[in-house]
Amino acid sequence: MSRRKQAKPRSLKDPNCKLEDKTEDGEALDCKKRPEDGEELEDEAVHSCDSCLQVFESLSDITEHKINQCQLTDGVDVEDDPTCSWPASSPSSKDQTSPSHGEGCDFGEEEGGPGLPYPCQFCDKSFSRLSYLKHHEQSHSDKLPFKCTYCSRLFKHKRSRDRHIKLHTGDKKYHCSECDAAFSRSDHLKIHLKTHTSNKPYKCAICRRGFLSSSSLHGHMQVHERNKDGSQSGSRMEDWKMKDTQKCSQCEEGFDFPEDLQKHIAECHPECSPNEDRAALQCVYCHELFVEETSLMNHMEQVHSGEKKNSCSICSESFHTVEELYSHMDSHQQPESCNHSNSPSLVTVGYTSVSSTTPDSNLSVDSSTMVEAAPPIPKSRGRKRAAQQTPDMTGPSSKQAKVTYSCIYCNKQLFSSLAVLQIHLKTMHLDKPEQAHICQYCLEVLPSLYNLNEHLKQVHEAQDPGLIVSAMPAIVYQCNFCSEVVNDLNTLQEHIRCSHGFANPAAKDSNAFFCPHCYMGFLTDSSLEEHIRQVHCDLSGSRFGSPVLGTPKEPVVEVYSCSYCTNSPIFNSVLKLNKHIKENHKNIPLALNYIHNGKKSRALSPLSPVAIEQTSLKMMQAVGGAPARPTGEYICNQCGAKYTSLDSFQTHLKTHLDTVLPKLTCPQCNKEFPNQESLLKHVTIHFMITSTYYICESCDKQFTSVDDLQKHLLDMHTFVFFRCTLCQEVFDSKVSIQLHLAVKHSNEKKVYRCTSCNWDFRNETDLQLHVKHNHLENQGKVHKCIFCGESFGTEVELQCHITTHSKKYNCKFCSKAFHAIILLEKHLREKHCVFETKTPNCGTNGASEQVQKEEVELQTLLTNSQESHNSHDGSEEDVDTSEPMYGCDICGAAYTMETLLQNHQLRDHNIRPGESAIVKKKAELIKGNYKCNVCSRTFFSENGLREHMQTHLGPVKHYMCPICGERFPSLLTLTEHKVTHSKSLDTGNCRICKMPLQSEEEFLEHCQMHPDLRNSLTGFRCVVCMQTVTSTLELKIHGTFHMQKTGNGSAVQTTGRGQHVQKLYKCASCLKEFRSKQDLVKLDINGLPYGLCAGCVNLSKSASPGINVPPGTNRPGLGQNENLSAIEGKGKVGGLKTRCSSCNVKFESESELQNHIQTIHRELVPDSNSTQLKTPQVSPMPRISPSQSDEKKTYQCIKCQMVFYNEWDIQVHVANHMIDEGLNHECKLCSQTFDSPAKLQCHLIEHSFEGMGGTFKCPVCFTVFVQANKLQQHIFSAHGQEDKIYDCTQCPQKFFFQTELQNHTMTQHSS
């Protein structure tokens, strides 16, 4: 059981009720001292305030103190306080009843009532003990969300739970610097640190036990007060004698009585005695020391009541009361024993307040701020008032219903009488200067407050008020600086201090200097000395009749008065006055003491000396009719003039004041002012700076700008809410919405995953279906294709299937690739208009050597030939196919080195190097299950066989002519067919402006001159036949068709109008048309006939010298002279320009063409015996724009737009770009990088058409494309440098798109 009894808490409704004397539940009092001092202090200070260190005896008191009274506590959570926490988290947890042990206990009344001071914060129930309340709160589990994992205790806050867990884990990070003790909480460490402090100022007067606070001592004194009961005093004293508290704490010596123990401590252990620095209350009979007056009085009544009847131990004089005895003892005190000065202060005598003698006054004046007073002069003591003593005076002071008095040095101690207060002051505060107690009626100096009180009762209360007024000196004091007249010196001093305190800067501290002869006040020391020297040089002996007025030795006194206290204390320095105001008037600014002194002096307390004098003046007026005035004349002390009336004398004094008083000048600008108020306003202007601030209406903070104020409002006065998008509920914190999401919207759902393919399913049925279709039906097929996911039973089938994913047959006309040769053949027939001849039977045995040779030549041509050069041949996207390739026989993959091919076969097909027989065997097994009945080819799938059968049946015709309804296999053939429906074939003139068109270039240029023919929905219209075309290619076909008919018009007319149009033949490589089939070289491969022009054949020869034209093949050719003449004739008739057969570049004259051939194509110049090939005269699709036909430079760099003569120069130029700038080309608009300028240009084209629905329109001819690279190819082929729209302002470069210009400017010209 703990030594500290659980005190019964006070009622919450009556906080001022006293504690009951009876103990609760029969708990016995136990004053046994605990062996561990640290545990004792922890037990005592368990109800201590952490902010102000004040100790309380119950939980309700400290709770009320923290909420309402403590100034150092700002929003403290009561639950976080150690005194309000759970029993396990408190140092005195052993005093509480654990909830686990109180399950069967009776809580008593659970509904609220006057006797149950502990209400529940969650419901309406209340309890009589804190332990019952704590146990009950555990039942509110919905209000206490945090649970201890060790003991399952519930908490309201997480911090309380974490603090409680430290008691289980033993986490003690707060270590004592004096010893090895460690604690888990900082407040426990603070309580422990008090054990190391040896200063315990509060000691029990009975058992001499020390305490750290007055509240702990007060709680301890309740134990001794209960021992004073008559029926229990004997037994309690006997019980106390049996306790261990009678042992000395230093030497363990035992004593029978506490008085003996106290004497022992005072004699043998003076360092532990309470009179180390001050004396205690001492008994006049046995000289025993006491701290409390109640202990002293009880001691004298119980011990010395029968020995002596209040007689003096020095002179044997007897008194009726103890107060008179102690008052008499003051007369035996020697002046040498008092530690004070012998120089009295005149002003101090006048300012001692009479209000201090009233019972209701509180002597709360700091003695350190008092002026030192003179020792009291022995006076004849007044007569005794035995008849006036009441019966209550003889009883103990502790039982009298008297008002209490407080000490001016230790405000917490209370005294029932002035006599005991005087004993306390002389015994406990000898080091403090003694006050002078002055009677305001007769100015008699009394040594103590008790003597002053007795003097007032005996002398001035027995007289008639009229006599008191007549006994007062009839003297009137006049102010030397104005016409104010007062009745006493105190009022005059108050008037000068308040009204004339700031006469000049030298007297700023309210210094007042009074003459000791005439009591005239001066503002400076020099003016006072001059007054004494001139006026009182022979009048040094003239004084008033009062004995006090003859004692001063120092003529100059500086005084400072507090205008906020009721008793108007005075001070001898400004520092002491400031200290007094800071300690006793915290809520009043110090500056108000000087600024508003004049105003506050008018509203003094009724108990102040000035108010008393004013009251006396009113009494005199009531008795005598008017205050007494000095008889005789008014003499001026400056010039000696005499006046019979006061008004004339005051008028005369004003003339002296104007010359004597210093002028009020500004210290900054030396400007003069008539009064102090105007001077103060003017000086304030020098020190004032007007600034504008923006003030927050909520917290009154100031800001210099509106932005700072708005930022403050957003940060401090804006509430951030969190809304759940699922249920639209609003929360005030992030933690709350996280908890809401975790509770309301976190539903568990099972996901079923297949362990074989890692697919997830929401229900088990879907998983079963997946296993049935994908794993049960294909158990035998373990080989799976990585491209399409199809499974096969053997590895051979998988390898055969993989070949379908490789496109090794490439079409060099349009750069498309195909898996099989039959698909390539089909593409050539439908898209590129091969010769319309029947396919020979695939089943024929053998082939002539000539056919095989042509087949090899065509295969080489398809793989190595390139398109004719145009303006964009110098781009980095051209593929170099001259390097030999090594192909895989199984999947068709090609590699540049044989070792790479071997690694591929080993890695992908498990074929080691040298296993040729195995390869053949595998090749034999690679046969499909689907066989063609026509050519006996096998296929692996039905779709492949169906596509193959279509090649035997003919091409599929999907495109229908809207005029005649005929179907065609490709859009190109449909376009050529639609041209035949035109009726304006012979004119070749524009049907809008009737302008004759002579060439394809003129036709295309003229179409751009009629923008009204463009339609965004249907496309263009031909200016000759007015048919609608949907693309630029179709328009070019129209131009070729119309211009071709125009050039052949004369020949047709000579043969007759009934003759049909001659059939044209196209080259399979460059798509040029020729009138005769003999102009083409015929090649036959796999039963498909192909025709190449002479230029394409020469180009293939230059690329592959081993390829020759088959012997017997009809090679058309003419002599050089004949060719030149023919060309010249053509130029005259048709106006056509010559074109180079190798590079397809046109020239104005034949000489330029020959010069070009000699310089550029020197290796292709034929011998003299050979004949010059005929250059085709008609081209359906010109490779360069008309603007580029006049230029000789045909190669242009995309990066810097430089133009070169041949391919070699531009390749070197591009290589230099790559060396200098690298392969990374960055787009400055989106920071993406590309490895070539062509890709960057295509990317910039996409930037230009962002948000256009995926369409790309040519900025020159307005052709629409669905891919950016197609538009780029169109610009390269159809438009030249002159067609570029956007010019750079800082360099000569031009661009087709604005995004190209922006990227160029940011890259090249940005600073």
Curated annotation (Swiss-Prot):
Keywords tagged on the record: Activator, Chromosomal rearrangement, Developmental protein, Differentiation, DNA-binding, Isopeptide bond, Metal-binding, Nucleus, Phosphoprotein, Proto-oncogene, Repeat, Repressor, Transcription, Transcription regulation, Ubl conjugation, Zinc, Zinc-finger
GO biological process, one term: regulation of transcription by RNA polymerase II
Signal peptide per UniProt: none
Record GO terms (molecular function): DNA binding; protein domain specific binding; zinc ion binding
Site feature (Breakpoint for translocation to form PAX5-ZNF521) residues: 72-73
Extent of Basic residues compositional bias: 1-10
InterPro entries, per database record: Znf_C2H2_sf, Znf_C2H2_type
Role of this protein: Transcription factor that can both act as an activator or a repressor depending on the context. Involved in BMP signaling and in the regulation of the immature compartment of the hematopoietic system. Associates with SMADs in response to BMP2 leading to activate transcription of BMP target genes. Acts as a transcriptional repressor via its interaction with EBF1, a transcription factor involved specification of B-cell lineage; this interaction preventing EBF1 to bind DNA and activate target genes.
Domain notes: Uses different DNA- and protein-binding zinc fingers to regulate the distinct BMP-Smad and hematopoietic system.
Name assigned to this protein: Zinc finger protein 521
Organism (species): Homo sapiens
